[in-house]
């Protein structure tokens, strides 16, 4: 077998996966003096569990979480960090919770222990995002990569089916773009295909049952673990750039934006992909036209499939495209204003070309 030259960078996070694995958090915190625990109030029972095991004085609970991580929230949380003299960060929650922990790690250089309760995948990456008045800024820094990640399906089992649908589609977007990334490699590529298979299987179960069963949950959680891993390993392209612009600039729900955009972005890229890549998409999504498969998966789970449905205004299409084109980045297909405007028009109306 002949391999093309490739580069691969692995990133070191220790992962605990399985039911009731949350107990590892208390053991890991025994090495620190005081933890800054970010968790919404609905997750307070898990915070109380840590307090019971370690003592109230060693756990500082911060419950404010806002999508897209506004800098004002970071300032508030950082001030509490300093006042309480904490020395480690614990994030129990979804992408916004983990995103706040990452923003604080940038300033404090403290380690992160992440316990994801959605399928966003942020817990496996060195990518951070912060929103200011000028919009959303993203970057990479090794300090924001959680040292430990605990995947406990018990914590995700109560997720509403609607959130499970959009959150798993968010994870699917990472896998999709890793497959056609300009800097992909055999390891990331194969993992991406496997992750996509697991997510699709979980989505089919979710759609059939209408509720998040433990079987579907574990498939989706494993797929999201792989999705986060590959998101960290290779570069993302048009889909992620557009999602950050629509979410950060226009205030749209993060996972819903990912859910809606995917089919239309893959259709935009389709002609630029190699036959082998196209064939692999067809195989893992079990469909002769994968963009349509993604649209059908979202629709079958009751997830949004149009930009209009998630509050985006048609008059903002050109503005969004201009922002996306302002800075160059690698993408399988040449990015043109006309092409991207046409893509968003289709996404707004919910109509693929075929």
Go through each PLM region and give its residues.
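Structural motif
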Residues: 14, 34-36, 60, 87-90, ...
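A short, small-residue-rich loop immediately preceding and capping a beta-strand
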Residues: 81-104, 108-119
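Active-site segments that bind and position negatively charged phosphate/pyrophosphate groups
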Residues: 182-296
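ATP/NTP phosphate-donor binding region
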Residues: 1-87, 307
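C-terminal charged capping/lid subdomain of soluble metabolic enzymes
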Residues: 2, 284-354
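A glycine/threonine-rich phosphate-anchoring loop and its flanking beta-alpha core
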Residues: 12-13, 106-190, 195, 276
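Short glycine/serine/threonine-rich phosphate/pyrophosphate-binding segments
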Residues: 22-25, 44-47, 71, 96-103, ...
């Amino acid at each position: 077998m002949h391999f093309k030259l490739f580069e691969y960078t692995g990133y070191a996070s220790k992962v605990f996966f399985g039911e009731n694995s949350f107990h590892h958090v208390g053991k890991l915190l025994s090495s620190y003096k005081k933890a800054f625990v970010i968790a919404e109030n609905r997750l307070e029972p898990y915070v109380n569990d840590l307090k019971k095991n370690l003592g109230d004085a060693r756990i500082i609970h911060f419950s404010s979480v806002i999508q897209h991580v506004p800098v004002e929230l970071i300032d508030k949380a950082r001030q509490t960090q300093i006042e309480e003299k904490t020395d480690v960060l614990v994030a129990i929650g979804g992408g916004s919770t983990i995103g706040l922990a990452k923003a604080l790690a940038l300033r404090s250089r403290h380690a992160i222990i992440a316990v994801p309760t959605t399928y966003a995948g942020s817990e496996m990456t060195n990518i951070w995002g912060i929103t200011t008045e000028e919009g959303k800024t993203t970057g990479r820094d090794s300090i924001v990569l959680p040292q430990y990640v605990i995947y406990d399906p018990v914590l995700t089992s109560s997720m509403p089916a609607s959130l499970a649908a959009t959150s798993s589609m968010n994870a699917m977007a990472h896998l999709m773009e890793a497959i056609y990334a300009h800097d992909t490699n055999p390891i990331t590529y194969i993992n991406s295909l496997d992750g996509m298979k697991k997510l699709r299987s979980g989505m089919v179960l979710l759609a059939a049952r209408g509720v998040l069963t433990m079987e579907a949950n574990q498939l989706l959680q494993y797929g999201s673990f792989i999705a986060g891993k590959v998101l960290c390993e290779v570069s993302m392209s048009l889909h992620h750039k557009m999602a950050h612009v629509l979410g950060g600039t226009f205030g749209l729900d993060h996972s819903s934006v990912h859910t809606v955009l995917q089919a239309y972005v893959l259709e935009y890229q389709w002609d630029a992909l190699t036959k082998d890549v196209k064939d692999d998409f067809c195989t893992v999504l079990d469909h002769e036209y994968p963009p349509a498969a993604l649209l059908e998966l979202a629709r079958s789970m009751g997830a949004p499939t149009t930009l209009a449905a998630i509050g985006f205004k048609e008059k903002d299409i050109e503005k969004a495209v201009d922002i996306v084109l302002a800075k160059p980045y690698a993408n399988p297909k040449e990015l043109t204003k006309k092409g991207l405007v046409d893509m968003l028009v289709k996404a707004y109306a919910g109509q693929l070309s075929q």
